Curated annotation (Swiss-Prot):
Gene encoding the protein: tsf
Superkingdom field: Bacteria
Name of the protein: Elongation factor Ts
Keywords of this entry: Cytoplasm, Elongation factor, Protein biosynthesis
Organism of derivation: Lactobacillus helveticus (strain DPC 4571)
Family: Belongs to the EF-Ts family.
Known role: Associates with the EF-Tu.GDP complex and induces the exchange of GDP to GTP. It remains bound to the aminoacyl-tRNA.EF-Tu.GTP complex up to the GTP hydrolysis stage on the ribosome.
Stored PROSITE patterns: EF_TS_1, EF_TS_2
GO cellular component: cytoplasm
An MF annotation (GO) of this entry: translation elongation factor activity
InterPro entries (UniProt xref): EF-Ts_dimer_sf, Transl_elong_EFTs/EF1B, Transl_elong_EFTs/EF1B_dimer, Transl_elong_Ts_CS, UBA-like_sf
Length: 341
């Protein structure tokens, strides 16, 4: 039987990232054969990963990497936020994002087959990480953005990588591209312009906003305040010429009822029309970046800011860790009882 030296154990750990006891056990099992020990750990890692496959991984980090005219953004999940601050996990996110930016895979299956710098596939790297770190580690999603030489990338990560953003701007400098990425990180838009918003999405969001108005009105009633009206429209897509014409006629009728002289209506109507438009484009302001108030200067919208700069937002990607994942609520006492069995 081969002697399992500390040097052998160290070498195996460096090549696989395995713990001391796992590395030693692997070498003992294969009588000191390094290649077989690596395969043993790999098989063991796949078995561990399979056992963890049904677990919910909703913590983690985003990764952002720019490689010339290609930028990649990823979300890598772990089960706990403690693991997401682990150096091995952080480095895996960086390496995986770099690999995707350089490999430019068409989909997740292609991404899993990409080779990392150490020669392992991306898929194997995540299997190994699950085995080594002891939690389910998964590449949840990625996106690629490309630009030409006349365009600029903006890349930004917020809150230690909990949010990642890539922007592609035309006619802008790097600072403007990054500032817009910071705005997008904070304001959570879904699309660039209102035209991209789905009609059903607008309807659904109006229902949510009107429900909030109902809740506010309950509080207002307690202090005898006038209730707020429901929103009828949510997007400029819905403000047709007929809708705007009717709004203008309603304003005229209101001014007449108030006894305002007709000769001053032309000075009042534009402001009231703008107020009508502002009140009835709330879905745009929440979800279309060009319609949002610019976070660096809320006296103007993002669209107005970019127009002043002579710039155009071509594309953006925003990832936030855990978006859309239902996190498992842990019963700590039950977990301890389970471990004591």
């Amino acid at each position: 039987m081969a002697q399992i030296t500390a040097k052998l154990v160290k070498e195996l750990r460096e090549r696989t990232g395995a713990g001391v006891m796992d590395a030693k056990k692997a070498l003992v099992e294969v009588d000191g054969d390094m290649d077989k020990a690596i395969q043993y750990l790999r098989d063991k890692g796949m078995a561990k990963a399979a056992k963890k496959a049904d677990r919910v991984a909703a913590e983690g980090l985003t990764g952002v990497y720019v490689n010339g005219n290609v930028a990649a953004i990823t979300e890598v999940n772990s089960e706990t936020d403690f693991v997401s601050s682990n150096d091995k996990f952080v480095n895996l996110v960086k390496d995986a994002t770099k690999t995707i930016a350089e490999g430019q895979p068409a989909d997740m299956e292609a991404a899993k087959k990409l080779k990392m710098d150490d020669g392992s596939t991306l898929d194997q790297a995540f299997v190994n990480a699950t085995a080594t770190i002891g939690e389910k580690i998964v590449l949840r999603r990625f996106a690629l953005e490309k630009k030409n030489d006349d365009q600029e990338f903006g890349a930004y990560q917020h809150n230690g990588g909990q949010i990642g953003v890539i922007t592609v701007l035309e006619g802008a400098d790097a600072a403007t591209a990054k500032h817009l990425a910071m705005h997008i990180a904070a304001m959570k838009p879904k699309v660039i312009s209102p035209e991209e918003l789905d009609d059903q999405f607008i309807t659904d969001q109006l229902a949510v906003m009107n429900h909030k108005i109902d809740q506010d009105n309950e509080s207002r009633a307690l202090v005898h305040k006038k209730p707020l009206p429901h929103l009828v429209y949510g997007s400029e897509k819905q403000l047709t010429d007929d809708v705007l014409a009717k709004a203008k006629e309603d304003i005229k009728a209101e001014l007449k009822e108030e006894g305002k002289p007709e000769k001053i209506w032309d000075r009042i109507i534009p402001g009231k029309m703008q107020r009508f438009i502002d009140d009835n484009t709330q879905v745009d302001k929440h979800f279309a970046v060009l319609s949002q108030d610019y976070i660096m200067d809320d006296s103007k919208t993002v669209g107005e800011f970019l127009k002043e700069k002579g710039a155009k937002l071509v594309a953006f990607q925003r990832f936030e860790v855990g978006e859309g994942i239902e996190k498992k609520q842990e019963d700590f006492a039950a977990e301890v009882r389970e471990q004591m069995k």
